[in-house]
Structure formats: C-alpha cells, structure tokens
C-alpha cells in the first residue's frame, strides 16, 4: 500500500466535494477546482466527511498513481480553503517590479520593460519594488507562474542578481583571480 495514498483525506466544514465517475470537483470559500483522476484509481466518499483513494492492484504504475492522485485531491481541498502563495525576491541594481492593474511590469536590466499578465485564477501582490508574491487556489498554476517569472532573469551565480524564490539559497561562484 502506498504510504501517502492509503491516508484518508479530511474534508473540512464549508468544503463541498462531488465525485462524478473519475471527475472530482471541490468547492470551497475561495473558489472551485476540478480534477480527473487517472484510469485505475478510485475516489470514494466515506463517513464523517472523509475521502478515500484506492487502487485495484499493486502494479508499479498503479502504486505511483495512487499516491499522486491522493495528493492532487488533498491539494485541491487545501487550495479552496487556504489557497497557495509563492514569494519571490528581486535583487540587483535597478531591478524592480511594479503593479499595473492586475499585471506586473518588471525592469530587469533589459532595454525594455517586461509585462506579465495574470492568468485566470492567479493574483499578484507587490509588497515592495523588490518583493512580490503569486497567489491562487491551484498549487500547480501558482508554482508554474512563479517559475516563469523567475525564468525572466535567473539568479546570477557570481553576484546573485536576478529573480529568486524567497528563502532560496543561490550557490555562489568565485570570480576569476585578479593580479
């Protein structure tokens, strides 16, 4: 049995879960999400607001899908109740971000400003010109948008300039030895 997959998923009060065949729909105070579970995996409602994820046999692929499916459904429930957030920091001379409506405008050392539009379900919060956070209910989408923003100017290993995740440690390199 998958250690992650066999754990039941607690459904908090205020969250409505509907299972229609392989499709699991979760509705909560922050919004709603749907996910189609992979073919051999079954999701069922138990008593006391508990969801159980089961697999038909112990094939290697089914074991992997079992834990994955359970985690994806649990992430949906967490997303519609608490939401997800990914913090980013910008370091470097003249590097900054500012909000333009629901979009972001970056100055990252290029000859032009970079404009990022907020995808559906994602909001940006700019705390300062060097700190921002990406927020939403879908964990995968929040992580993807944050990774795309980081990709605009990855941290430089020599001076650690660029866009990085909050708390990320940049492995520094020693520059060439001067005479």
Curated annotation (Swiss-Prot):
One of its GO terms (molecular function) is rRNA binding. Gene3D superfamilies: Ribosomal protein L6, alpha-beta domain (3.90.930.12). Keywords: Ribonucleoprotein, Ribosomal protein, RNA-binding, rRNA-binding. One of its GO terms (biological process) is cytoplasmic translation. Signal peptide: none annotated. Disulfide bonds: none annotated. InterPro entries: Ribosomal_uL6-like (IPR000702), Ribosomal_uL6-like_a/b-dom_sf (IPR036789), Ribosomal_uL6_a/b-dom (IPR020040), Ribosomal_uL6_bac-type (IPR019906), Ribosomal_uL6_CS (IPR002358). Coiled coil: none annotated. GO terms for cellular component: cytosolic large ribosomal subunit. It comes from the Bacteria. Part of the 50S ribosomal subunit. This protein binds to the 23S rRNA, and is important in its secondary structure. It is located near the subunit interface in the base of the L7/L12 stalk, and near the tRNA binding site of the peptidyltransferase center. Belongs to the universal ribosomal protein uL6 family. This is Large ribosomal subunit protein uL6. It comes from Streptomyces griseus subsp. griseus (strain JCM 4626 / CBS 651.72 / NBRC 13350 / KCC S-0626 / ISP 5235).
């Amino acid at each position: 049995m998958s250690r992650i997959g066999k754990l039941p998923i607690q459904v908090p009060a205020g969250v409505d879960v509907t299972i229609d065949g392989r499709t699991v729909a979760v509705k909560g105070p922050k919004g709603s999400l749907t996910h189609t579970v992979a073919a051999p995996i079954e999701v069922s409602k138990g008593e006391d607001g508990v969801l159980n994820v089961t697999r038909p046999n112990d094939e290697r692929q089914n074991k992997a899908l079992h834990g994955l499916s359970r985690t994806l459904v649990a992430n949906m429930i967490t997303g519609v109740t608490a939401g997800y957030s990914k913090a980013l920091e910008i370091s470097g001379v003249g590097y900054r971000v500012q909000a333009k409506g629901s979009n972001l405008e970056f100055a990252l050392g290029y000859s032009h400003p970079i404009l990022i539009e907020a995808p559906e379900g994602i909001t940006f919060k700019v705390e300062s010109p060097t700190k921002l956070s990406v927020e939403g209910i879908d964990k995968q989408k929040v992580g993807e948008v944050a990774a795309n923003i980081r990709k605009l100017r990855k941290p430089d290993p020599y001076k650690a300039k660029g866009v990085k995740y909050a708390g990320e440690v940049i492995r520094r390199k020693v520059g060439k030895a001067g005479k």
